[in-house]
């Protein structure tokens, strides 16, 4: 059994090494420009960030550089993921490789951009000013960056749902009917996932869950277009059965 899995494990190791190597190279490049990236990250917050420990500045630079490296490396990561999956697919299923890489990377960037320009400014402003009449908001640079990266990467991953639906529908694993049937269960799962990948506050979870519900609806439409239910065939079969029944009745008469 292990001998059968060995080639797959070796292939997985190869793809992981390429992905990790890409992230590492991107990290080194981003670390050189971490101050510029930090200014971009801080642009959504007009307040002052503080440093609570001597090592905090280094940790902030590492966090920012690593997060930026992941975003930059997404096309390569999707490409390596596809190269690992592709050998187990049929020839016609492999035709989705370019849409998978292109739309996978694109939807990740759209999710990150949606979080940066729409969600994050509102959430940070709300949380920073909540209770401002009782205490002063002194946000550390490290906690701010952690909050920012978790939200940005979380939305980037969440926006992959339509891409996943397209891929699964293309290989025939799901249909729009199956997604509709599990809709109420999906809502529960969506709120659980939102609670896991977002910072621990209700506002962030709601802002994550609502777009996910919309993306689930979009996934239903995508599955319907890619792998539609064979209604025409069913209607044709019903008509044929009716015609056969009528012919049999006439013959008996």
UniProtKB/Swiss-Prot annotation:
Pfam families xref list: TatC
Question: What would be one Gene Ontology cellular-component term for the protein?
Answer: TAT protein transport complex
Region (Disordered), start-end ranges: 231-253
Q: Which terms does the record give in the GO molecular function aspect?
A: proton motive force dependent protein transmembrane transporter activity
Which ranges are annotated Basic and acidic residues under compositional bias? 244-253
Membrane topology term reads: Multi-pass membrane protein
Q: Which residues cross the membrane?
A: 18-38, 69-89, 96-116, 151-171, 187-207, 208-228
Where it mainly occurs, coarsely classed, is membrane
Q: Indicate yes or no for the key word Transferase.
A: no
For this protein, the record's InterPro entries field holds: Sec-indep_translocase_CS, TatC
Q: What highest taxon heads this organism's lineage?
A: Bacteria
Q: Where in the cell is it found?
A: Cell inner membrane
Q: Which family does it belong to?
A: Belongs to the TatC family.
HAMAP family assigned to the protein according to its UniProt record, in alphabetical order: TatC
User: What function does this protein fulfil?
Assistant: Part of the twin-arginine translocation (Tat) system that transports large folded proteins containing a characteristic twin-arginine motif in their signal peptide across membranes. Together with TatB, TatC is part of a receptor directly interacting with Tat signal peptides.
Q: Which named protein is this?
A: Sec-independent protein translocase protein TatC
**Species the sequence originates in:** Helicobacter pylori (strain ATCC 700392 / 26695)
Gene of this entry: tatC
């Amino acid at each position: 059994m292990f001998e059968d899995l060995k080639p797959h494990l070796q292939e997985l190791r190869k793809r992981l090494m390429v992905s990790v190597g890409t992230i590492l190279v991107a990290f080194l490049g981003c670390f050189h420009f971490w101050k510029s990236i930090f200014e971009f990250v801080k642009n959504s917050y007009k307040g002052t960030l503080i440093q609570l420990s001597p090592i905090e500045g280094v940790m902030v630079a590492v966090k920012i550089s690593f997060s930026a490296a992941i975003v930059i490396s997404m096309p390569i990561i999707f490409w390596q993921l596809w190269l690992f999956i592709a050998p187990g697919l049929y020839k016609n299923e492999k035709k989705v490789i370019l849409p998978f890489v292109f739309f996978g990377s694109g939807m990740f960037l759209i999710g990150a951009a949606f979080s940066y320009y729409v969600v994050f400014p509102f959430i940070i402003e709300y949380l920073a000013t909540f209770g401002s009449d009782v205490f002063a908001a002194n946000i550390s640079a490290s906690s701010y960056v952690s909050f920012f990266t978790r939200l940005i990467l979380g939305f980037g991953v969440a926006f992959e749902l339509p891409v996943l639906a397209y891929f699964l529908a293309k290989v025939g694993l799901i249909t729009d009917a199956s997604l509709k049937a599990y809709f109420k269960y999906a809502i529960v799962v969506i709120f659980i996932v939102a609670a896991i990948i977002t910072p621990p506050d209700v506002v962030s979870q709601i802002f994550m869950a609502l777009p996910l519900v919309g993306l689930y609806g979009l996934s239903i439409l995508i599955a319907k277009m890619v792998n539609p239910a064979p209604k025409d065939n069913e209607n044709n079969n019903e008509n044929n059965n009716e015609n056969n029944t009528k012919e049999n009745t006439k013959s008996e008469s």
